[in-house]
Amino acid sequence: MIDLSASPLSTVAVLGLARSGVAAALALQAAGKTVLAWDDNPAAREAAAQAGVTISDLNVADWKLIDALSLSPGIPHSFPTPNPITVKAKAAGCELLSDNELLARAIEGKGIRLVAITGTNGKSTTTALTGHLLRSAGVATEIGGNLGVGALALAPLPTGGVYVLELSSYQLELMPTAVFDVAVLLNISPDHLDRHGGMDGYVAAKRRIFAGQHPGQVSVIGVDDAWCRAIAADLDQRAVTLVRIDPDQPGLDLSQAKALPGRHNAQNAAAAIAICRALGLEDSAIQAGLNSFPGLRHRQQQVATLSGVTFVNDSKATNADAAGNALGCYESIYWIAGGVPKDGGIESLRMFFPRIRHAYLIGHAAKDFSVTLGETPHCLCGDLATAVRMAFAQARRDGLEGAVVLLSPACASFDQYPNFERRGDHFVDLVEQLKVGAPA
């Protein structure tokens, strides 16, 4: 747990009592602060109370007595419709911030480095890889933010340690003063536009990661898209080191990095390499870490190979760009896709359709995806269990070398699952069930 006792904030409201909110409330309470914690969901309030959080109804709070509102990132405060509690907080002049902002303030001036990683796609892999490289080299490191535990539940680090935070656009909006020793923007493509009032708001939230940096700190940016190229051109005008990353020239040998397939992972690796070099690691130590990286669940996770058919869990691919990264890695694909679609659907994936032997469509997007796929062989399966069963049967009948049953939905999961992790776990469970009747 992060020590917040030195914070000048005396009374803090916490809205949203999931993982990060509970961690924030407990850290603030442990620091002797007055905490008013609330969640609109009664079940979340009960679970938080059982964890030791003091519950107070923020709908009737006296906001003149509250210094700051620590807001869970999933709660809207501007677009599309702000939560009523955030409206009251703003009207009272209360500062809105996040648990990640509180962490940044707590370690300021203590000789602990802070790395932040954002981007529409690739954040989690880059964060996990960076943490792995640093730990493999013997650097005291904690990773968190949007990945793993809440920021304030991370372990304290000694001088010279490194916190590596994965940050979403939602989280960056709630970090008004944080400055990062190494700030990374991997890429930008349209996503979460309703929460940011359009593309301009989304880009502005991502760009916030570079705010306030000064000489001696490092900015790392991918330049595969027009938005990032424009940001990089602006960053060139500052007196801060800027590193442009190129997936075609990642900087070290990735041939033995088996958990990092594809061009998109070359970009993730290039970013992690740039981060570690900025923090003083030798290339030999970085290379050893690349080769030993085990990968992440739900990100092109190879689950099993049955009867010559490989099953890949890429449930984290919640938009077309992410799914395209996976589709570009394999030649004979039995593709499971669908869920709650993002703007544009899968139109941008047409270049990969020749690789798709058959597509199995699930969830709300199935009919729209069917129209886009056109003459590409496909069927509407409805649910994941049916899709896995049908994909495996077809792949076995076809007998193609290198056949892959790929769950890379290009959609959010919320029509059938609470999150992408549950969707991916169900896929893994279904593959395990197939093992009973299939030769390895």
Locate the predicted segments by residue.
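N-terminal leader/targeting and accessory segments in enzymes
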Residues: M1-S98, L102, P261, L281, ...
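Nucleotide phosphate-binding/pyrophosphate-handling subdomain across enzymes
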Residues: I2-T11, A23-A31, A140, K258-I356, ...
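Phosphate-binding loop of NTP-binding sites
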Residues: T11, K64, P73, H77-V223, ...
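Residue-level signal for inorganic ion chemistry
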Residues: L28, L69, I117, N146, ...
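Short internal beta-strands
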Residues: K33-D40, S219-V223, I336-A337, P354-A365
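Short beta-strand "acidic-cap" motif of Rossmann-like dinucleotide-binding folds
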Residues: T34-D39, E142-I143, V164, R244, ...
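Short, polar loop motifs at secondary-structure junctions
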Residues: D39-A44, L58-N59, E101, G148, ...
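C-terminal helical cap/extension that packs against the catalytic core
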Residues: I85, I346-A403, A438-A440
